[in-house]
Structures are given as structure tokens and as C-alpha cells.
Amino acid sequence: MTSPDLAFTVQVLSQFMHSPKNSHMEATLRVVRYIKGAPGLGLYMTAESTNNLTPYCDSDWGACLQTRRSVTGYLVKFGEALISWKSKKQDTVSRSSAEAEFRSMASTTAEIIWLTGVLKELDVEVQVPTQLMCDSKAAIQIAVNPIFHDITKHIDIDCHFVRERILQGMIRTNHVPTKE
């Protein structure tokens, strides 16, 4: 999938591949018409020399009406160039929007680690800490607060994973308003 603007739509439509209804086929044809009508659209890479990764993470809490599982979404920019993105249904049902957002943050953190490693292999130094942008103040508080409560016990592994990267100075969480 090389079109980030279609990532969420394709993720939703792929759930109905084995027994599609007419509405799913019509939606798929709309996607095909969109692609056919926009053949020149692509990713824009600038020649600037900034070596910073800027990841944004988000989730859609309980988005799947059948399972109530949330959808994780993220994108990562290197300078001004979009280099990675994902839209995927989470593996388990989240009991709160903060939990869904935090699972998205953990997934994005794993991607940051991988991308930093790839860039290092290419002899490209990345500025640290990476500024991880998130629209959930609750998820950010969970990430920076070393005290774990009953409400975070079931996402304990993700909490320690993200918190460890913060303490290592690899990432820093920043709030970005939902509207941006």
C-alpha cells in the first residue's frame, strides 16, 4: 500500500474480502475510481537537511461496530517527507479511549525504534529525542507517570515499553490538539 490517504479505507474494506456485500463492492469501486483519477499523486520528498523523525499517533476508540475493537493509526515524517504510516484494527478491545490511544502510542514507538535503526544502518543520524505527537492527554500522562494503577494494569507491558524509551531519551511525548 503506497497511498497513505487510502490506508484507513483499505483497512476497513479488507475486513469484508471473504463475504463482500454490494455496498462493499461499490465502496471498492469508488477507491479504484479515485486511484484512476489521481495517477500523478505520490509522496513528496524535499531536499532539506533536517534529520528529525516526527511521528503522530491516534486511535479511533471502538471503531469496529461488530467487535468494538479500536483502530490504531500513525504516520511518521522524516523532515517534511512522509516515510511510514499505518491504519490497523487493534488486537484486543480497549476498555477506554485512553487505553486505545496508548496502544497506538506503543505501536508508534515500536515503529520509531525500527525506523531509527534503518536510518542508522544507512549512516543517517536522527535527532533525539524523537517528538512523538499524540492528541490524548490521558495517554501522555500514562506514558510519563511511573506509577501504575489498576486502570493501567492490563496495558502494563505497553506502559513499561514506552516509559523505558522516554527514560532512555529516545522519545518525548507531546500533545497536539485533535483539530490539527
Q: Where in this protein do the model-derived segments appear?
A:
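C-terminal reverse transcriptase regions that engage the nucleic-acid substrate
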Residues: M1-G42, P177-K179
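Short, conserved phosphate/pyrophosphate- and ester-handling motifs at nucleotide-, phospho-/glycolipid
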Residues: S3, D58, D135
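Active-site-proximal flexible loops/turns
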Residues: V10, L65-T67, I142-V144
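RNase H-like nuclease module associated with reverse transcription
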Residues: F16, R30, Y44, N51-N52, ...
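Structural motif corresponding to the C-terminal cap of alpha-helices
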Residues: M17, I35, P39-G42, A63, ...
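Structured nucleic-acid-interacting core domains from mobile-element enzymes and related host factors
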Residues: Y34-C57
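Acidic, metal-ligating active-site segments
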Residues: D60, C64-E80
